[in-house]
């Protein structure tokens, strides 16, 4: 294993695989904050050169966090298909990149090979790709999952309807839900971030969602994005629930900071498969985002792209229906501007798809970040080309409860029309039955949620 290279007469020496991974990263303020970033563009290129020559075996043998001290590492390593890994362990990261991008390499071949990868390998190959590489590669890797409906099929683009409200008022929530449905949002999930994180409030909102779903016979999923334990208590108390949600991190310490561990997730999955309202096998929803481990001092000296890839390795164990990065939510301390947010969104989507999870993206930014709505529309457009499974849908893209900006109802509708994609088939049929869509396009009735009331 060679950890040095000479460029233009200057020799660059790296002390570990972890340092190579960090310094090969595209520029991120979070890595600078952690003291891990390359000090110059030249050092970044040198790290990429070294990384390109490392073998997949080198990366397997040097996980970001030791196996003996971290359950996320154990999950990632234990879930590797050893027969597949043995065939590729001698490949360099550069060879893996070339193989994925080769036009002769098929989706099924990539899916099979991905079973032999660890998250560090996934992160490594992402670091050697341009933005267009990430888009081209990701669109070769469709990933589907089934709850009440099946998400991720080619030709579809889905949307989470996010009817957040500042006081969790049921009527206010309902108004946002009906408006979103009329725009074609909500086929991925109708999912609310509650103000009050209690089992009682979770149950109250879930029952309202279930009433809406049953009254208008909507083929979709419902979820309230409270803490995982609050949702479990609500389900045990009899609340209807299709999906249980949790934010996840790429280390055991990061998950502990969120207040859960792998056993908690396993118990939630078992509970929902037994007592939930979903018809399919995929009953979990995870959110991630570059930099969350650093914010809880749980990054173990590892760069934020590698830690993000480890989130997907953890998620895969539990066969989720939905996984999405909330790409610009943490702020400029981790992703400084639109350029960094765009890069992170493309990286995250590619890494999730290569890992094998049903990957979406909350294309978003905070008010103090150097980004605006045009930048977020740019990212959503690029991710649509990349085959992203779903985006968020919030009234006018302005979340008045979480106080950040993301995509609205109209963006997904426009992107579907531009690319010839539709909502999930059963939901698309419902839209046409209700008069909101005709021949794959929204009608004049779209946007009038009150039409569902009369």
Where are these regions (language model features)?
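Anaerobic metallocofactor- and corrinoid-dependent redox/one-carbon enzyme cores
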Residues: 1-174, 182, 189-454
């Amino acid at each position: 294993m060679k950890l040095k290279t000479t460029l233009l007469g200057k020799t660059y020496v790296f002390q570990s695989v972890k340092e190579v991974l960090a310094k090969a990263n595209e520029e991120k303020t979070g890595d600078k904050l952690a003291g891990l970033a390359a000090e110059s563009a030249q050092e970044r290129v040198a790290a990429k050169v070294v990384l390109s020559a490392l073998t997949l075996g080198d990366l397997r043998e040097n996980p970001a966090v030791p196996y003996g001290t971290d359950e996320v590492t154990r999950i990632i390593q234990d879930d590797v298909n050893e027969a597949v890994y043995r065939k590729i362990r001698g490949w360099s990261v550069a060879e893996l990149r070339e193989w994925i991008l080769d036009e002769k390499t098929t989706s099924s071949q990539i899916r099979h090979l991905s079973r032999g990868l660890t998250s560090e390998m996934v992160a490594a190959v992402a670091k050697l790709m341009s933005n267009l590489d990430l888009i081209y590669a990701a669109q070769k890797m469709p990933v589907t999952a089934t709850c009440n409906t099946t998400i991720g099929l080619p030709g579809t683009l889905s949307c989470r309807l996010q009817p957040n409200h500042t006081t969790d008022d049921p009527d206010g929530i309902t108004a946002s839900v009906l408006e979103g449905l009329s725009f074609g949002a909500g086929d991925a999930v109708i999912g609310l971030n509650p103000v009050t994180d209690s089992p009682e409030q979770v149950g109250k909102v879930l029952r309202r969602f279930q009433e809406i779903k049953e009254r208008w016979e909507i083929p979709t999923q419902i979820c309230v994005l409270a803490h995982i334990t609050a949702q479990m208590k609500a389900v045990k108390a009899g609340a209807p629930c299709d999906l249980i949600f949790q934010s996840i991190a790429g280390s055991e310490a990061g998950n502990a900071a969120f207040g859960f561990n792998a056993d908690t997730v396993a118990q939630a999955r078992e509970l929902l498969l037994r007592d939930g309202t979903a018809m399919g096998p995929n009953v979990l929803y995870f959110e991630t985002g570059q930099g969350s481990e650093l914010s809880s001092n749980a990054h173990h000296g590892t760069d934020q792209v590698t830690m993000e890839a480890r989130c997907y390795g953890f998620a895969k164990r539990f066969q989720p229906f939905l996984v999405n990065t909330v790409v610009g939510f943490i702020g400029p301390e981790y992703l400084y501007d639109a350029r960094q947010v765009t890069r992170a969104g493309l990286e995250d989507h590619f890494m999730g798809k290569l890992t094998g999870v049903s990957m979406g993206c909350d294309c978003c930014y905070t008010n103090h970040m150097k980004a605006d709505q045009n930048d977020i529309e740019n990212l959503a457009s690029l991710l649509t080309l990349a085959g992203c499974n779903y985006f968020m849908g919030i009234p006018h893209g302005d979340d008045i409860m979480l106080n950040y900006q993301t995509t609205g109802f109209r963006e997904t509708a426009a992107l579907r029309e531009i690319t010839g994609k539709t909502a999930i088939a059963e939901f698309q049929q419902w839209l046409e039955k209700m008069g909101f869509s005709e021949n794959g396009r929204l009608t004049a009735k779209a946007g009038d949620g009150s039409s569902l009331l009369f």
